[in-house]
Amino acid sequence: MGGGPAGLTAAYLLAKKGVSVTVLEADPDYLGGISKTVSYKGFCCDIGGHRFFSKSDEVVELWNEILDEDFIKRPRKSRIYYKKKFFDYPLKPRNALFNLGVFESALCVLSYLKARAFPVRNPANFEQWVSNRFGSRLFSIFFKSYTEKVWGMKCSEISADWAAQRIKGLSLWSAVKNAVFGAGGSSGGEVIKTLIDSFHYPRKGPGMMWESAGRKIEKWGGVIKMGQEAVRISKTKDGYDVVSRSPGGEEFHYEADFVISSAPIREFVGCLEPAPPADVTGAANALSYRDFLIVGLVVKDRDIFDDNWVYIHDPSVKVGRIQNFKSWSPDMVPEAGKNCYGMEYFCFEGDGIWASADEDLIKLASEELVTLGLAREGDITDGFVVRQKKAYPVYDDKYADNVETVRAALAGSYPGLCPVGRNGMHKYNNQDHAMMTAMLTVENILAGKDVYDVWKVNQDAEYIEEARDSDSGGRDVPKTA
């Protein structure tokens, strides 16, 4: 269930072993889930901005196996836009000092020293976690506005788990060390994902990887059904009966020994028949998600900025981040003298942004791009809108308990139902983590027993054999057969 990185990784590895697989993907046009590439008049749009970087050699090997020569190396450059100025990210002290000014920089240093001397013990929310590592003043400058745009909630209401997973290992000191010694630190230390200076990328966006995986799955006898969404999963004597529905309302039945689901937990649990106990369905329904849309703007290319993306820390505009698709890969832009920017807006399905007409969103994005100084009046020649439901699982103060309730119920009463990936496990991690959960699920299926607890895969796509603090390391994942 699901044709994103997790679902397709599982199908790819199983089909390669000769196992009969069927992939149900609700999108009628694109494979890749939130890692798809949307094409508009030849302009390629990466709807979420996907760097292909992993500490897991196994994941990297699989990427190279799937795509091979179309998997290119690209420089990483991103900056923060704050008070009409661009700040390098990772932090470069001279740049930050110049942009902030001596007085503001001194206040930031004092705030950082105070945080180190008097940290919040056992930080429970995002604001506390980040302030402990950067100081409250830098938190307010470089984290607060953007993060609250992403989640639509105050930083004090966001679980510290999200910060620990997304910016693990990063602090003001590590950023300064990176500026002086490079991403590996002064002694060749561990690379922090947030600080990498290059990454690999498919020539025409992440969807190119997953479309290639789909073709190979079908070559090995696997079946991919586009435009079919699972609506019921019923236990049978030998496994499960999965019912999918097409956009036209036609239903299809599939018999399965195992069901691997990367669908959002809330939807997945809602498909189960008979329904699980009330506490389980209640826990699933209590999980929430943040939705997302991107406005693609085709512009005259004036080389105003060459970042892969720019984080907008300006509360006067609604855009949260701007992607520069030509900087991801020149092959994503088909016309000389043109570029395509992706204006990212975070929202909830049905709210004002989400429900706006495409022409209104294109007008809003165009005005904000000019206001920010990243385009001139008359530079924007075309535009399009892509909406993505349930792009981000929300980490509120109850999410961990709710996920555990569902996980325990599935493990105890539904053998052979295997949640994987970001939404399938309600873990806001990158695609290498999603892929590793699928890889280990396949290992369990092929072994005929639970060799690995997939829930122990950490944010770095590493398998942790014993419970440890989220900042601890783990051994490399086992090689698949």
Feature locations, PLM:
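N-terminal Rossmann-like FAD-binding beta1-loop-alpha1 element of flavoenzymes
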Residues: 1-23
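Conserved Rossmann-like nucleotide-cofactor binding loop
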Residues: 6, 29, 266
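Active-site/ligand-binding neighborhood in enzyme catalytic cores
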Residues: 9, 96, 106-234, 239, ...
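Glycine-rich FAD pyrophosphate-binding loop
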Residues: 15-39
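Short phosphate-binding/catalytic loops that engage adenosine nucleotides
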Residues: 19, 222, 374
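Dinucleotide-binding Rossmann-like beta1-alpha1 core, especially the glycine-rich loop
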Residues: 41-118
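Acidic, Ser/Thr-rich low-complexity intrinsically disordered segments
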Residues: 463-481
